[in-house]
Amino acid sequence: MNYPHPLIAREGWPFLAGAFLISLLVHASAGFWWALPLWIITLFVLQFFRDPPRPIPAQPNAVLAPADGRIVVVEKVQDPYAGREALKISVFMNVFNVHSNRASVDGKVEKLEYFPGKFVNADLDKASVENERNAVVIRRAADGQIVTLVQVAGLVARRILCYTKVGDSLSRGQRYGFIRFGSRVDVYLPVSARPRVTIGEKVSASSTILAELDEVK
């Protein structure tokens, strides 16, 4: 499995180093019991920024989950970023989920659009249109179908990181972004896509199949 990233995300290294050093200093000067709450915080930071490799399903028409979390939306809507009717599937990430974002399909980035906004609870439907967000529109390499991935900031998450640009080619499971401390990813698919998940279901980035696309003849 080719996943060329450290098991602890680079985005978390400064936080982890700071938490570790403060815990160590308090431990050395005041003892273990005074430092215990700080060590617990350090362990929380460590688990929050974990970024493990994941197996990728072989089905060529599968759309993979872009993030770990829980399904909160499966419905037909308008895709405001690609201007079409679409099937929308949303993944809500709480603070205990892995927060790296990974490409759902193989394809080329056709459009990248950032929107400033609010920071309401990402579990709410209005977060998709009111919160700070970053949309990546991907045209599938195999058949030209469009898949839109939208990183949505949450109540605690105030920083969306996106590492791709227009013209880049992405592979399924490729890491393309990160959102800190609780957030959401909206996935807009062709309206003919067949959902493979239901509301409330827990999913894993790159491993869970969200939907299957029809073959384009």
Swiss-Prot record:
The gene is psd. Catalyzes the formation of phosphatidylethanolamine (PtdEtn) from phosphatidylserine (PtdSer). This is Phosphatidylserine decarboxylase proenzyme. Keywords: Cell membrane, Decarboxylase, Lipid biosynthesis, Lipid metabolism, Lyase, Membrane, Phospholipid biosynthesis, Phospholipid metabolism, Pyruvate, Zymogen. It comes from Cupriavidus pinatubonensis (strain JMP 134 / LMG 1197) (Cupriavidus necator (strain JMP 134)). GO terms for biological process: phosphatidylethanolamine biosynthetic process. Its cofactor is pyruvate. Binds 1 pyruvoyl group covalently per subunit. Is synthesized initially as an inactive proenzyme. Formation of the active enzyme involves a self-maturation process in which the active site pyruvoyl group is generated from an internal serine residue via an autocatalytic post-translational modification. Two non-identical subunits are generated from the proenzyme in this reaction, and the pyruvate is formed at the N-terminus of the alpha chain, which is derived from the carboxyl end of the proenzyme. The keyword Membrane applies.
